[in-house]
Amino acid sequence: VARLEVSRVIAAPAARIWDDLSRLETHVEWMAEAASLTFLGEQRTGAGTRIAVVTKLGPFRVTDVMEFVAWEPPRRMAVRHTGLVTGSGEFLLDEAADGSTRFTWRERLRFPWYLGGPPGALVGARILTVVWRGNLRRLARRFTS
């Protein structure tokens, strides 16, 4: 199991970040590895929403199927990964007294044997950590004037 965590302070209040974050279709605008996002059903927000995200990292391409299992505005959203890569993930927003927000992204991912299994998860975690730090930089830029 790969455990990943990246975090960044964003110069915006949690509610403003949540408003952007809750529009799931926009995640492809700031997530470099997300090539496309498709809703699996009519629901677009909240716990129970299901999505399929085509994820591309270098030559690798997988469809990441996720169900939102927690939706707690403006503090937390969490997913269960049920596609080729399984596990769980969450976004946490912690607003500071100065109005900025610490955004933390945590994941626990299990890779199938044909994607390298546990050794692949270790390598994948290192690569994803770098990619996700870049994602959080792009997300933070959405809130600069």
Give the positions of each predicted feature:
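Hydrophobic ligand-binding cavity/cleft-lining segments
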Residues: 1-41, 46
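Residue-level detector of alpha-helix boundaries and kinks
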Residues: 2, 12, 53, 78, ...
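Well-ordered beta-strand positions in beta-sheet-rich domains
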Residues: 5-9, 63-65, 88-90, 106
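Solvent-exposed residues in well-ordered beta-strands and their adjoining turns
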Residues: 9-13, 54-58, 69, 94-96, ...
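Amphipathic alpha-helical segments that line or abut small-molecule/effector binding pockets
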Residues: 15-18, 133, 137
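Glycine-rich portal/gate segments that line the openings of hydrophobic small-molecule binding cavities
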Residues: 26-28, 38-88, 98-102, 134-145
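Beta-strand/loop substructures that line and gate deep hydrophobic ligand-binding cavities in soluble
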Residues: 80-133
